[in-house]
């Protein structure tokens, strides 16, 4: 008896997906609830599990195919088990026992990430030389860099042993090698959506960016004094994102236009704050949403940001986790960015960019002092938000961070 495998419901407004990878081959045994195939939507990656135990009987949708919700992907034959082909005696006698590293690599069916594959090709590193740290053992760029840092021996190109006489190589023979320096990789659904949405935001909104700078001394001092006690009581580390989210929520109460959106000829003002927190992953940028952030304590915000961040990096975010945001915060500072002009996350009317904290000489009470400074950037939709409102919003965020007591006193 065969059981059909169909595309599950992928969430509100998501009608199709791309078949990313089949984890099993035809005839291979599968356990109940074992992932069979990976689907890529324009928002998340979804694994479709096997509803029964048996073997993969049929594959209908090939890797790279676009499928709609409830479309037939394949079928599993319930109760059947695949039979592994036993190696011949000659093969057994010739093949040496694989090392632990080779066993780990051979069992990994995930192809290396494109950036990792490029580095491996450039440095003549075999897949068997690397243990992947990504999802299901996928080799990531960081894994290759770690191997290179350890000085792994690369595999040199094979040289014919039939002659020791140097052989001249014509330019025509080099040409195919030069062509291999480029790589064409199909864009994932997520990357296509990122590209489309960012360009649509630029084309639709009257986008403008205003800047300010903030002295992080107060926040850093507060964090240093209470980080151990905070973690002991709440079970989560005290980071910077919690302070920024609280400061943003505080400023949005005073300037609701920055938390609004346009719908046709109407402006919708939101009396709540669903803060989108931009998270970088191997497959692209995603923006999970901290719902009702304005009603949360600092500890609750930090816990929710941590939870969503882990789901994002593991590729387990649900579509609902990324819907309904009213304002976005992005922190390019974790990558070393000194300043940027963030692009709006439509249909939102504002996005705040945080950046690297750098010690700079500042004039404080007529004296030169070294202070940890950060540039802030607010990109906003000028159709809704006036310049005065945008500047005031950024000043309020600055004031809350330089004097965190204002958040407690609601000033």
From Swiss-Prot:
Superkingdom as given in the UniProt entry: Bacteria
PANTHER family in the record: DIHYDROLIPOYLLYSINE-RESIDUE SUCCINYLTRANSFERASE COMPONENT OF 2-OXOGLUTARATE DEHYDROGENASE COMPLEX, MITOCHONDRIAL, DIHYDROLIPOYLLYSINE-RESIDUE SUCCINYLTRANSFERASE COMPONENT OF 2-OXOGLUTARATE DEHYDROGENASE COMPLEX, MITOCHONDRIAL-RELATED
Known role: E2 component of the 2-oxoglutarate dehydrogenase (OGDH) complex which catalyzes the second step in the conversion of 2-oxoglutarate to succinyl-CoA and CO(2).
GO molecular function: dihydrolipoyllysine-residue succinyltransferase activity
Record-linked PROSITE patterns: BIOTINYL_LIPOYL (PS50968), LIPOYL (PS00189), PSBD (PS51826)
Listed pathway(s): Amino-acid degradation; L-lysine degradation via saccharopine pathway; glutaryl-CoA from L-lysine: step 6/6
Similarity section: Belongs to the 2-oxoacid dehydrogenase family.
Enzyme class: transferase
Composition skew (Low complexity), residue ranges: 82-100
Residue positions of the active site: 382, 386
Region (Disordered): 82-115
Needed co-factor(s): (R)-lipoate
Domain Peripheral subunit-binding (PSBD): 111-148
Lineage, highest ranks first: Bacteria, Pseudomonadati, Pseudomonadota, Alphaproteobacteria, Hyphomicrobiales
Protein name as annotated: Dihydrolipoyllysine-residue succinyltransferase component of 2-oxoglutarate dehydrogenase complex
Sequence ranges of Polar residues compositional bias: 101-110
Residues covered by the Lipoyl-binding domain: 2-77
Species whose genome carries this gene: Bartonella vinsonii subsp. berkhoffii
Keywords from the UniProt entry: Acyltransferase, Lipoyl, Transferase, Tricarboxylic acid cycle
Alphabetical GO biological process terms: L-lysine catabolic process to acetyl-CoA via saccharopine; tricarboxylic acid cycle
EC number(s) per entry: 2.3.1.61
Subunit structure: Forms a 24-polypeptide structural core with octahedral symmetry. Part of the 2-oxoglutarate dehydrogenase (OGDH) complex composed of E1 (2-oxoglutarate dehydrogenase), E2 (dihydrolipoamide succinyltransferase) and E3 (dihydrolipoamide dehydrogenase); the complex contains multiple copies of the three enzymatic components (E1, E2 and E3).
A Pfam family: E3_binding
Recorded name of the encoding gene: sucB
